[in-house]
C-alpha cells in the first residue's frame, strides 16, 4: 500500500473574512492589532506557510484575490469554505485548500504542515483542535468535495460546518498551547469583541518579549 502524501505546492490558502462582526461593532478584518490590521496579520502568517492565498470577503482586501460567497443569507463559515474550495479547484496543480479565520491572528506557524502530514488519503479532511476543542474553520479540505458541499448546502437548512464534517472522513490534529512571557496562549484565541481585541494586544506584546 502506497503512503499518501501531499506537498505544499498542492495547497492553496484562503482567509475567511466574510462574517458580520456584530459583537465587534465594526469590520473585524480591518481592526488594528498593533500596527497592522487583523487581515494583514493573518495573511502574513498564512502566506509564510502556503501560496497562493486569497480572502473570502465581499469587498476588496489588501493585495490578494477576493472571492465572495456563492451562497447568501445565513450560510455562515460553510459558505466561505465552499467558496474557497471552488476557487482552489480552478488553480492548476492544487488538490487541497486550507482555510483560516481572520479573527485568529495567532494560529500555529506549522498549521498547514501538520494538517497535511495527518492526511492518510486524498479524500480525507484534516481539522485543527486545541484544549479539547475542535476548530473546524481551520481545516485542510480536498477541492473535490466542492460539488458535494454545494449539493448539501442547497438541501440542508442547518449549514453548519460540524454537520458537514459528520458526512466525511475527518482527522483531527491537536495543537499545543504556545508559551509566552505572560502565560500559555491558545493559538486559536479568537477576537469577537473590543475586549478580545484589547486582550490580543496584550498577547501580541507577550509574544514579542
UniProtKB/Swiss-Prot annotation:
Keywords tagged on the record = Cytoplasm, GTP-binding, Magnesium, Metal-binding, Molybdenum cofactor biosynthesis, Nucleotide-binding, Transferase
Q: Please state where this protein is localized.
A: Cytoplasm
Q: Where is it mostly found? A: cytoplasm
Residues that coordinate or bind GTP: 16-18, 28, 56, 69, 103
Write down the required cofactor(s): Mg(2+)
Assigned EC number? 2.7.7.77
Q: Name one GO cellular component term.
A: cytoplasm
Q: Which reaction does it catalyse?
A: Mo-molybdopterin + GTP + H(+) = Mo-molybdopterin guanine dinucleotide + diphosphate
Mind telling me which Pfam families this protein's record contains?
A: NTP_transf_3 (PF12804)
Q: Which PANTHER family match?
A: MOLYBDENUM COFACTOR GUANYLYLTRANSFERASE
The cross-references to NCBIfam families, in alphabetical order and at most eight, read: molyb_mobA (TIGR02665)
The protein's assembly and partners: Monomer.
Free-text comment about domains? The N-terminal domain determines nucleotide recognition and specific binding, while the C-terminal domain determines the specific binding to the target protein.
Name listed for the protein in its UniProt record = Molybdenum cofactor guanylyltransferase
